Amino acid sequence: MKKGTVLNSDISSVISRLGHTDTLVVCDAGLPIPKSTTRIDMALTQGVPSFMQVLGVVTNEMQVEAAIIAEEIKHHNPQLHETLLTHLEQLQKHQGNTIEIRYTTHEQFKQQTAESQAVIRSGECSPYANIILCAGVTF
């Protein structure tokens, strides 16, 4: 369910069509995107826009119930991992709900992207900067 406004019509459209438990991926520039999944490519150049910039816009618009992250981020990108956890904690407070955080292997993560409504590609060029967001409801 949509919560606010976003200028990108593709992102706005996909969020408006999400039902409870549907998923949406925000990823770095390197994640392989299945041909069967809608690709929304925001990448302009390396690092632009960043993963966190795209995630911030998406989570301002989308009610999030759960998040799936690759286990490997903990060791290969600990700074982004901490930033991501802080963002999700702040989002919980803003939304007034608990966001379940699940970890999986990167290989399983890539397989799960095929089930998502869309994959939004950022310009991020740091390892494992990817998240699967599970839609919640606003009531």
Swiss-Prot record:
Lineage top rank: taxon: Bacteria
Record's keyword annotation contains Mitochondrion: no
Enzymatic reactions: beta-D-ribopyranose = beta-D-ribofuranose; beta-D-allofuranose = beta-D-allopyranose
GO cellular component: cytosol
Main location group: cytoplasm
Keywords, in A-Z order: Carbohydrate metabolism, Cytoplasm, Isomerase
Subcellular location as annotated: Cytoplasm
One of the record's GO molecular function terms: D-ribose pyranase activity
Active site residues according to the UniProt entry: 20 (proton donor)
Pathway the protein takes part in: Carbohydrate metabolism; D-ribose degradation; D-ribose 5-phosphate from beta-D-ribopyranose: step 1/2
Transmembrane segments: none
Homology family: Belongs to the RbsD / FucU family. RbsD subfamily.
NCBIfam families: PRK11797.1
Identification of the protein by name: D-ribose pyranase
